Amino acid sequence: MRTRLAGTSEDGHLCPVEAPFPNVDFLLHQQLQQEQDVYANSTTNATASPPIAPTSVLPRPSRPSQSSAAERTSPESPSVRQSPTKRDRNPGPSSISGAGPLNLEHQSPSQQSQNQQQQQQQQQQQQQQQQQQQSFYARSRRSGNFNWKLSHSRNGSIEKPPPSFFSSSFSHSPSTPPLSLGAPANGAAHSKEMEKEEEQKFVGKRPRIRSPWAITFVTLLISILGIGFLALVLNSSFTRHIDPKGCRMSYMRPGYAKFDDFDTEHTRFASKYSLYLYRELGIENDAKVRGVPVLFIPGNAGSYKQVRPIAAEAANYFHDVLQQDESAVKAGARSLDFFTVDFNEDITAFHGQTLLDQAEYLNEAIRYILSLYLDRTRSDRDPNLPDPTSVIVLGHSMGGVVARTMLIMPNYQANSINTIITMSAPHARPPVSFDSEIVKTYKDINDYWRRAYSQQWANNNPLWHVTLVSIAGGGLDTVVPSDYASVESLVPDTHGFTVFTTSIPNVWTSMDHAAILWCDQFRKALVKAIFDVVDVNRAAQTKPRADRMRVFKRWFLTGMEEVAEKTVPSKDPSTLLTLEDNLSSVIAQGERLVLRSLGASGAVRAHLLPIPPSGSPEAKRFTLLTDHKLDVSSESGRLEVLFCSVFPMQPGQAVAGFAAQINLAGDSSASTRLACNNAASDVVTLPASLRSSQYPFSKEGEPPKTHFSYLQYDVEDIAEHQYVAVIEKTHTPTPGFVIAEFSDVSQSHRTRHISLRRLLAFGMKFRLPSSRPMVSELKVPTMQSSLLAYNLEISEQNCGKQQELFAPLIRQYLTEPYESKFFVNAREAAVSIHGVAPYVPPPLKSRSTEDGLSFQFWTDPTCASNINIKMSIDVMGSLGKLYMRYRTVFAAFPLLVVTLVLRKQFRIYDTTGVFISFSESLDLCLRQSIPLVLAFLTFLSLFIWNSSSSATANIWNWANVTSGAIDFHQNDLLIGTQDPFFWFLVPVIGLICVGICTVFNYMTLTLVHILSTAVSLLSFRPGWIRNDERRKALPLPAFYPTSPRRRMVTTAILLVLVSTLIPYQFAYLVCCLVQLTTTVRAQRLASDLRSAANSNFYNYVHSILLLMLWILPINLPILVVWIHNLAVHWLTPFSSHHNVLSIMPFIILVETLTTGKMVPRVNSRFKHFTSVLLFGIALYAAIYGVSYAYMLHYLVNLVAAWLAIVHSTSDNWSVLSGIKHISCTLFDAGNTNNVGGVNGTNNTMLAEDCKMRKEP
């Protein structure tokens, strides 16, 4: 058997060559020399058959030539060039340039006879090749109604080579070996003429075949700009506007008791999950329950041991403080029994079914926990107390979402949960939308909560007694954007709120995703708040909902919010203050009280400030600031503040109703009695701001810092009182200060209406006059977005010869959600907020036009100097805000670029027959389609943002059309914000994605070339094989034919596994690996045997590989969940990820490409379907890709299905081939019965096709 090294098709096109690697040029030269000898021998024999064309040429890509004369190379050159316009069906003798006539006179007759026999064998072999080509053309030129143009195949050899180690298990090919096809065979003359006309029509238009590594200046420049912009974003994110870390370490002595009897009789997940009870060793040494049940739910890939910092603090706080406080025990305070769940570090952020499984398990766990308190052998609880009926739930990260999910599950026990506290939990939307199940689960949960709180009557609200507090870590949390922790779109402010750790008194620091569990300052505040809502005297184990909300606001909010309740107006007088009847202690109306030290008089002294009447035209506000702690009633401290009214006591009237009495009149009969309320319960704790202050918190290893005490009341809140009494209780001189005053709200509050564009261009300046009040407030309504960062600068306050009482203190704050940040010793401040964020649903209560970022400035009013304040947008700092808010964009938006590039490749290929490289197509797209699409999306975003018609909005949010209701999906589109100021984000993200796609393309090229080089080195043939003349003729390991049955069996096995055991994401990963293998093999062949056909196929499979790799991140999270479940021996299949239709097109397409078949060209109207499909996917990826990223897999799956259909039209085992077989059967039956036949040309073509299909 003789192996053909190269040849030409009937139309003159060059076929791919197979030769042993790596001595291709040497073997080619040897074969050409042999064929010259054969041709020379044939010329000396008059009876010899006509000469034939040489059969061994190695084509190389060249520019199309307009000349009709074919170029031929010398034997030393390994290539032959032919004009694409010269189509010679029966080529004559081919002359070799540079080869003169050969001398045959010295040959013997036996040698001449041997040469003649060899020539006859070559003629027979060529005739067989021509017959096979004609048969293949006849079968493939009429493939249904699609009007394909068959492309070049991959492997030019018609002999089946031996298997190679590099051949994939998916490497199959049809029984008929692929050939290099150009024009139709001799079957029909009119088909040949049509091909000639079409070829002449597009000749000169074919693009020049360029290297896949080539890049134009335009593409390079745009890619550098995109990558540079991405580098600026990343650099800004990690270097600018970084909140300082202030958490102190916590310590504990953990112990865990596992409940082994909570088994499969209680829940079907008992073999996967476990329930534990935490015990602080040294304090709680047994496993009996005795207090209030609290359930901790770990987050995504979290551990049950993460409960230990909070549980340890609770055990120590009750043991050291509350247990010794009889009033607290009488009020219902008891120890906390912390239960925790071992989820085997389940991954819930990416998989909705896992989230539902955990919620189902936890409901059964709560049922079991409550039953423990009924078992006297396992409970050490006071029998006089009611049995618990509910559990307090703490959730971290996704554990907080699981906690809310429990209430919508069918196995939820009514009223078993009434208090939920979550930490860094993404309530507003899923962290990623790669799984359809988690997107649906989030929608079901949030819709249920919104629907419950929209009920008019409490009886119709199943969540009426539930309170939800969401605590966010702030800017240091880089795992989940803290914007997603907002619950303003889920619950009204009567049932829950969102607060940031920077707002919590005595915490005042941001925290990362894990530190929020072990931060010492925060866990102390959290534990105290939990103990404050506990009441074991009630079966619910907690106080009523209204009282719980009041407690949470007091512990977690600053106390200066509008919702903060003041206790002074609602309390009865508790202190009786007796003063002399002289007016020396009364401050004149409108004057300010300033004390630079305490105890200077050596005795207790009272300072009275008259309270202005509430009916005055100018609104007044009382403020007091001191660096001393305010005493409660009957406490022996240094300073006490009272709100007093004249007490008209009659002679002999009892004064026993007062808890404390302060007598400053002595034995004087001329005295005034005042009934007073103590203001210590309303005090606001502020961080101390001195010249030595750097941070509002104390860092690890630093001694605790002193704090400022601040009081703030509107006159209406204290209108029932007549005086504010400031009592100096110390008898010895003590350093410190007190400033108290009544100020006009009009002077202390300012609102600046300035557009963001003007703020960006010119900044904003304002001045605090020398006659300013102690506290000034500034509100800027336009500053709401989380995407902007600001710089604030404040000038020095000049106090002259007087000593400065305190350094400037600044508080920035938002009201929805509750976020406050403090800047001590402020000279400048880096301002960033978590306000209106991309993709976050709008709140239940619409925002006021006056809502926005606000600032409070505490400055020393005794310094008679102006203070200038300047504010500007920090452009570089704002770039860093894009990282956390738009990370998921880069899983969807680059698909816009890839699909547009692939669309351009197919359009050029269908027109010219050349499948250009990805980089060349990207260059063409950057000159037209990509800018146009980005411009269209930009105008579309402006149209959606500025549309005031709800009907127009419903066009895009068709899944959430509710008349008269809030559209909670209005921020799901495009870049997720309705602020037209950010219109430029669409082209900026597009620019970055172009750079990312370019880098990713070259990374893939590099990987493919590295693998190709590695395979070439591993397959290097040793010398004893290279010197074997018979082994030299073995072809390269390329694309080998395999039986269709084997291909179908392999596909069927994969589909069966997907439908039963493995998720389709695993099969998709396998497809990507096989496609990578195919690309490596195509690259080897394209580099070893240079031809247009090889380059076309390599560019094609490379682009398909890039498309599949961009979808891979969407499928990997589910695959990770599946592998994790296998690791914990949980073999229950995913019900939501076994749809074979989600992977079958990919398997078929990848199987087809392993055979080396190039996709046929489409010249009919169906070629527009490819363009429309890819363009539609590009638009979807840009508009809906972030919110519904899981849909991108299904859309690309449609592309794979369409390409598989296109491939099947030229495949001899395709469905269309089966239709042809049926047509041939009917044709034969019609001829036999002499009925139903067809006439004319169609009859001849069908008969020829059926005849050739019957030939072996």
Curated annotation (Swiss-Prot):
Gene, per the UniProt record: bst-1
Coiled coil regions in record: none
Location in the cell: Endoplasmic reticulum membrane
Protein topology in the membrane: Multi-pass membrane protein
Enzyme class: hydrolase
GO molecular function: phosphatidylinositol deacylase activity
Full protein name: GPI inositol-deacylase
Biological function: Involved in inositol deacylation of GPI-anchored proteins which plays important roles in the quality control and ER-associated degradation of GPI-anchored proteins.
InterPro entries in the record: AB_hydrolase_fold (IPR029058), PGAP1-ab_dom-like (IPR012908), PGAP1/BST1 (IPR039529), PGAP1_TMD (IPR056824)
Organism ancestry: Eukaryota, Fungi, Dikarya, Ascomycota, Pezizomycotina
EC number from the UniProt entry: 3.1.-.-
Keyword Secreted: no
Biased composition regions of type Basic and acidic residues, renumbered to the chain: 190-202
Compositional bias per record (Polar residues), positions renumbered to this chain: 37-48, 69-83, 143-156
UniProt-annotated stretches for the region Disordered: 37-203
Positions annotated as glycosylated: N41, N45, N155, N235, N582, N960, N1212, N1239, N1242
Residue stretches of biased makeup (Low complexity): 59-68, 107-135, 165-180
Record field: transmembrane: 214-234, 882-902, 929-949, 980-1000, 1005-1025, 1053-1073, 1103-1123, 1130-1150, 1172-1192
GO biological process, one term: GPI anchor biosynthetic process
Keywords: Endoplasmic reticulum, Glycoprotein, Hydrolase, Membrane, Protein transport, Transmembrane, Transmembrane helix, Transport
